[in-house]
Design a protein with these regions (language model features):
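Active-site-proximal, well-structured secondary-structure segments within enzyme catalytic domains
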Residues: 231
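Structured secondary-structure scaffolds
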Residues: 1-228, 237-257
């Protein structure tokens, strides 16, 4: 995964086009003056005051004009393009940390952040641009670690797609097998690799959880069970449990899920 990031970065040969021609998105806060014939002069840019942001140039007007001047000779016109989605989503860490507000305690306490969880297909977009923007504005990385997950594939190991009609929602799976069975299946996934939707694993997980539940219910149903008295086998179990917790914690901290 790191090699994919390196290859993308090292082979960039063009500038980042930050504008998109779409009907939705974050507006680019720019107007342009029109000449005496009503033609747009794209070199004569009108910028809003920072204190007025955010603005929509298709709705708001520059200070020296009125709405009636829009599209008229010696008037103005608003920028029609919107920002590339990665231009704005690459600011996610700063937005969460409330960068730019008067109280910067939260920004100073959580930025840079610890972990960015994301999928592998947007390494060259979301991960790359977020790092670029963090260096541009703060001269630092936005987070210490990136945790890359794979895709959930259908039973035939094909990418799930609405157009193909092979999407399986987690809600239906949880209702059929239970949340713990789904967790059991998810625990079998390896970091950075794709995982197949496998009902056999859900069935195994469901049976295992049911056995654990019944065993716990059986133990707790006996009044003779003395919680304050430890037998040798109880102490051995607690030692093994403590060792397991320490090992699992160590693995999690190293992202060895």
């Amino acid at each position: 995964m790191s090699k994919r990031f390196e290859n993308w970065t090292e082979n960039l040969a063009i500038d980042w086009c930050i504008s998109r021609q779409r009907f939705f998105g974050v507006p680019i806060p720019v107007w342009y003056r029109t000449d005496e014939k009503g033609e747009v002069n794209y070199n004569d840019v009108i910028l809003p005051n920072i204190s007025d942001l955010p603005i929509d140039p298709d709705i708001d007007t520059p200070d020296e004009f009125e709405e009636g001047d829009r599209g008229k000779p010696n008037g103005f016109i608003g920028e029609k393009d919107v920002f590339d989605t990665w231009f704005t989503s690459s600011m996610t860490p700063q937005i969460i940390a409330k960068w730019g507000l008067e109280d910067q305690d939260e920004m100073n306490s959580i930025f840079p952040m610890d972990i960015r969880p994301q999928s592998h297909e947007i390494i060259r977009t979301w991960a790359f641009y977020t790092i670029v923007k963090a260096y541009l504005h703060h001269d630092t990385i936005p987070w210490e670690n990136v945790v890359i997950s794979g895709w959930i594939l259908d039973p035939d190991r094909k990418k799930m797609s609405k157009s193909k009609g092979n999407v399986i929602t987690p809600v239906d799976t949880i209702e059929e097998y239970g949340a713990d069975a789904v967790r059991y299946w998810a625990a079998s996934a390896r970091l950075g690799t794709d995982t197949t939707y496998d009902e056999n694993v859900f069935l195994v997980g469901n049976k295992l959880v049911t056995k654990m539940y019944n065993a716990a219910k059986f133990v707790l149903s006996h009044d003779s069970y003395q919680i304050n008295k430890l037998n040798e086998i109880d102490a051995s179990f607690i030692r093994d449990l403590e060792e397991m917790v320490n090992n699992v914690t160590s693995y999690y901290e190293k992202f060895q899920f």
